[in-house]
Amino acid sequence: MSKTYFTQDHEWLSVDGQMVTVGVTHYAQEQLGDLVFVDLPQSGTKLSKGEAAAVVESVKAASDVYSPLDGEVVEINEALTDNPELVNQKAETEGWLWKMTLQDETQLEELLDEDAYKALIG
């Protein structure tokens, strides 16, 4: 059973055991507008919490996506290479960005649950 968390930088995480799927929230993609390009980390990349890991580029602006946790990228969403608009259409499902390992479970305590995230975006 997976559990979903959110960051103040508008990323969502689905945690299932030691596997974490990361994406941008529906709110974030609305703020960005239509995405035209997504630059993802390479599989095998070791990320530190807070490190810029990906870039999402829209017709309005380019924005960094930060790693919400320490871990290693094990898979990227290859579908976004040809279809970056999946992030706009299905931000919190098929529009995920990368999957990574969970190295330090205590970092999850610093994340937001759904209610706290909804309060943040008001």
Swiss-Prot record:
InterPro entries: 2-oxoA_DH_lipoyl-BS (IPR003016), Biotin_lipoyl (IPR000089), GCV_H (IPR002930), GCV_H/Fam206 (IPR033753), GCV_H_sub (IPR017453), Single_hybrid_motif (IPR011053). The keyword Phosphoprotein does not apply. Binds 1 lipoyl cofactor covalently. Its cofactor is (R)-lipoate. One of its GO terms (cellular component) is glycine cleavage complex. One of its GO terms (biological process) is glycine decarboxylation via glycine cleavage system. Keywords: Lipoyl. Residues 19-101 form the Lipoyl-binding domain. The modification N6-lipoyllysine is found at K60. The glycine cleavage system catalyzes the degradation of glycine. The H protein shuttles the methylamine group of glycine from the P protein to the T protein. HAMAP family: GcvH. Belongs to the GcvH family. The glycine cleavage system is composed of four proteins: P, T, L and H. This is Glycine cleavage system H protein. The lineage of its organism: Bacteria, Pseudomonadati, Pseudomonadota, Alphaproteobacteria, Hyphomicrobiales.
